[in-house]
């Protein structure tokens, strides 16, 4: 193992200029969800250039590269090709698609979320070919579509491959991550009876029912996890079926962003909201005659390959125990490679790791870059962390293969 790591470390240092160049090319190529085709082509070409044994693009547009190993456990490296919008370009210190390097950091949209980590993973898998070391089992590098809007790409991957373990490469400041809260998006709809605003007694105003529900929402008893913290629910968007200001709407809807801990399933969330609706609407005379419903939102997404899927707005939560053998092996490997013990942490946001765990694939998290900068106009990734990450990803492949035996 030590000999393997020394060889991998030496090869990773040689690769560093190429990793940076590759990341800059990825960052300079915009790839919003559903428009990842150009970046997918760049990634596919890079994998072929690096000598991957197999490279292909699946029906939804994910790019998969395989490094063939022995008969041991297969390990998946997972990262997404899409990114969020830049927002106002004038708010960026440097052009968001320039990939400009300033003071040892590479700037730009998706530099850390997550084209930099994807580049590091692609080169980490290639290290085994570079030094002629056959991994214990196959390495599957999966660069996926549409993580930012649905997780469609990884859900498809999880249904196609039976890897024995996975690394979700989202940024983590090169600290091992073992889980996160999930996300469930709900729409609560209140239906009344429309009328002219000058004769409100002829209608049933759904605004009052929505107000009663929102007033009661903070009283919900939300579960607490000693590691992940409490579940949270946040009202975000509010819409009506009217555009005229002198008409009582017949229907209003509000969106709830629910961040759930593993002990709280989507079905439990729906039941809680229904109970609260019944209680809050029964308490006020102004809400009589109003009907309320709650559902998990869904949306149809179309990939750049033309495949359309209707998916619910659910990102599963997960949490591996610190005593889990995958966490233990990964932590030991990182301490050995980095020469320091940064401990084990969690993410504060949802990732595709939840979809992998739901599919039964044990998943750890690790990636270069400060995740607090994701989705901001300060997004950038330290080159030093990228150099560390290449060797760390390779070491984690070996560690997870050992844990999966």
Regions found by a protein language model. Give the residues of each.
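Hydrophobic/aromatic beta-strand patches that form the interior of the parallel beta-sheet core
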Residues: 75-77, 142, 165-167, 295, ...
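Metal-dependent amide/peptide-bond hydrolase catalytic core
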Residues: 2-3, 189-405
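Active-site metal-coordination/substrate-binding segment of hydrolases
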Residues: 73-143
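Acidic-glycine-rich active-site phosphate/pyrophosphate-binding loop
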Residues: 86-101, 178-189, 332-333
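Fold-level recognition of mixed alpha/beta catalytic cores in primary-metabolism enzymes, strongest
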Residues: 116-219, 225, 377-391
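N-terminal helical capping/dimerization or prosegment-like subdomains
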Residues: 2-87, 251-255, 269
């Amino acid at each position: 193992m030590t000999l393997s790591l020394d060889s991998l470390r030496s090869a990773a240092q040689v690769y560093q200029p190429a990793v940076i160049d590759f990341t800059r090319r990825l960052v300079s190529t915009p790839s919003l969800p559903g428009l990842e085709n150009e970046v997918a082509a760049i990634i596919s070409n890079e994998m072929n250039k690096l000598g991957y044994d197999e490279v292909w693009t699946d029906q939804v547009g994910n790019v998969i590269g395989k490094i063939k190993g022995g008969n041991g456990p297969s390990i998946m490296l997972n990262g997404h090709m899409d990114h969020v919008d830049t927002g106002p370009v004038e708010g960026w210190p440097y052009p968001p698609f320039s990939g400009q390097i300033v003071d040892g950091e590479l700037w730009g949209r998706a530099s850390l979320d997550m084209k930099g980590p994807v580049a590091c993973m692609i080169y980490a898998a290639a290290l085994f070919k570079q030094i002629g070391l056959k991994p214990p089992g196959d390495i599957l590098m999966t660069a996926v579509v549409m993580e930012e809007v649905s997780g469609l790409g990884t859900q498809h991957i999880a249904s196609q491959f039976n890897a024995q373990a996975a690394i979700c490469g989202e940024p983590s400041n090169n600290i091992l991550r073992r889980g996160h809260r999930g996300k469930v998006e709900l729409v609560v709809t209140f239906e009344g009876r429309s009328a002219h605003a000058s004769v409100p007694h002829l209608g049933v105003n759904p605004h009052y029912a929505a107000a009663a529900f929102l007033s009661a929402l903070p009283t919900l008893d939300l579960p607490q996890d000693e590691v992940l913290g409490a579940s949270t629910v946040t009202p975000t968007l509010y819409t009506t079926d009217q555009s005229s200001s002198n008409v009582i709407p017949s229907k209003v809807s509000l969106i709830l962003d629910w961040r759930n801990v593993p002990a709280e399933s989507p079905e439990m969330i729906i039941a809680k909201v229904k109970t609260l609706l019944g209680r809050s609407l029964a308490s006020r005379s102004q809400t009589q005659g109003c009907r309320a419903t709650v559902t998990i939102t869904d949306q149809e997404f179309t990939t750049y390959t033309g495949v359309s899927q209707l998916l619910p707005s659910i990102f599963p939560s997960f949490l591996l125990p610190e005593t889990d053998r995958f966490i233990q092996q990964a932590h030991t490997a990182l301490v050995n490679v980095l020469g320091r013990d940064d401990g084990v942490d969690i993410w504060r946001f949802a990732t595709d790791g939840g979809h992998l765990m739901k599919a039964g694939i044990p998943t750890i998290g690790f990636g270069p870059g400060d995740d607090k900068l994701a989705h901001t106009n300060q997004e950038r990734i330290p080159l030093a962390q990228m150099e560390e990450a290449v060797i760390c990803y390779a070491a984690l492949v070996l560690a997870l293969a050992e844990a999966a035996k």
